Amino acid sequence: RMATESAITTDGSHPYSTGKDECLVHNGSLSNHNNLRRELVKKGNIFNSENDTEVAAGYVSNSLSNKKSLKDTLTSGLKDLDGFYTFITGTKKGFAVVRDEIACKPAVIAETKNYVAIASEFQAMAHLPDVNSAKIFEPEPGIVYSWGN
């Protein structure tokens, strides 16, 4: 996924990774990313772009380094990350998705016994194996859904 808020280059493309075995994909916009960036830099984070997604990934990495679970990290993010967004973030142990409490950005999940797929719209998943028997749903706003951790 290419950036839409910063320079449209491969450096600004998703997924973002700011920690070992961590990545984040983001659809939306953070209005407080500059303030959050300054706070994270004071804590030792290093950023390589002006992209708000890199700041969100840094927030996740910082929280995970303080021994928070991925689910707890994204739950805290609901109050700390101001904006409209859907985040998908993964670690070596699992992955999670969260939509902001207003749910301005679309998301759909297809869950089977063999896989979990997440996209902005169902059409992106229409040709997946066994999708017709999948549990398909829109994640509720302000709720963190996690798998494997």
Regions found by a protein language model. Give the residues of each.
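Conserved short alpha-helical segments that host acidic/polar catalytic motifs at enzyme active sites
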Residues: 1-149
